[in-house]
């Protein structure tokens, strides 16, 4: 009987961590993210387990264990972050996992009220701030901001390396940041399409005119296409 009484606080802490982690994960699951209900519940529960085990073996070390948990979650969060061209996806999901670990730490320490308050705030951040971010994205772009552009040029495949180097020199001259450079076979046989991913000032007209006018002087280039990256 005494052993059961001793186990009750341990189980209560783990259940609280699992439930609050699942609550955070439910929102991620609803939005069809990679790390959903189960992942967040397990992260919170695991963090609570580490805290509880450290308190059992060395009651003075939960702070040190909490710091180790933060480092460990970094590896897990990196697994949900993906780069697609110039776009990075999964940052919010990784941050949510990090927060779930924090909830688990609070539950492991028995700070249930703090854990519940933090869970509510995390959910508000993921739900309410999402709407705010979408509204901000719909506002006119600041002239002082940056935009992403896609520049595509088509050339004969034998001239690809020369055109690539020439393109790099022009981009450097235009003082615009090159984020990526690659090539794929063009629709016309024997030709290559070189794709440059650029980041520059939102007022891009002068930069675009400079790049296109310089490219137009190269006889090896048969087609040019400039567009704003809408992703």
Curated annotation (Swiss-Prot):
Chief location of this protein within or outside the cell: membrane
Lineage of the organism: Bacteria, Pseudomonadati, Pseudomonadota, Gammaproteobacteria, Enterobacterales
TM region positions: 5-25, 39-59, 62-82, 103-123
GO cellular component: plasma membrane
The protein's role, per its UniProt record: Virulence factor required for growth in low Mg(2+) medium and for intramacrophage survival. May be involved in regulating membrane potential by activating Na(+)/K(+)-ATPase.
Family as reported in the entry's similarity comment: Belongs to the MgtC/SapB family.
Top-rank lineage group of the source organism: Bacteria
Name the record gives this protein: Protein MgtC
Keyword Lyase attached: no
Pfam families listed in its UniProt record: MgtC, MgtC_SapB_C
Entry membrane topology: Multi-pass membrane protein
Subcellular location field: Cell inner membrane
Keyword vocabulary terms for this entry: Cell inner membrane, Cell membrane, Membrane, Transmembrane, Transmembrane helix, Virulence
């Amino acid at each position: 009987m005494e052993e059961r009484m001793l186990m009750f606080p341990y189980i209560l802490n783990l259940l609280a961590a699992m439930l609050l982690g699942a609550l955070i994960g439910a929102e991620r699951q609803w939005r069809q993210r990679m790390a959903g209900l189960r992942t967040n519940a397990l992260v919170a529960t695991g963090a609570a387990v580490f805290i509880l085990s450290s308190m059992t073996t060395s009651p003075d070390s939960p702070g040190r264990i909490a710091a180790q948990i933060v480092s460990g979650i970094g590896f897990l969060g990196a697994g949900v972050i993906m780069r697609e061209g110039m776009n990075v996806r999964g940052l919010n999901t990784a941050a949510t996992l990090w927060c779930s670990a924090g909830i688990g730490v609070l539950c492991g320490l028995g700070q249930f009220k703090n854990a519940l308050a933090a869970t509510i705030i995390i959910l508000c951040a993921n739900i309410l701030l999402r709407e705010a971010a979408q509204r901000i994205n719909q506002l006119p772009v600041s002239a002082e901001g940056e935009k992403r552009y896609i520049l595509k040029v088509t050339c004969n495949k034998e001239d690809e390396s020369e055109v690539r180097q020439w393109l790099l020199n022009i981009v450097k001259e235009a003082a615009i940041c090159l984020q990526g450079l690659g090539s794929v076979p063009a629709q016309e046989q024997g030709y290559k399409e070189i794709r440059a991913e650029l980041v520059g000032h939102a007022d891009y007209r002068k930069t675009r005119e400079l790049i296109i006018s310089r490219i137009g002087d190269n006889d090896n280039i048969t087609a040019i296409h400039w567009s704003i990256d809408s992703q």
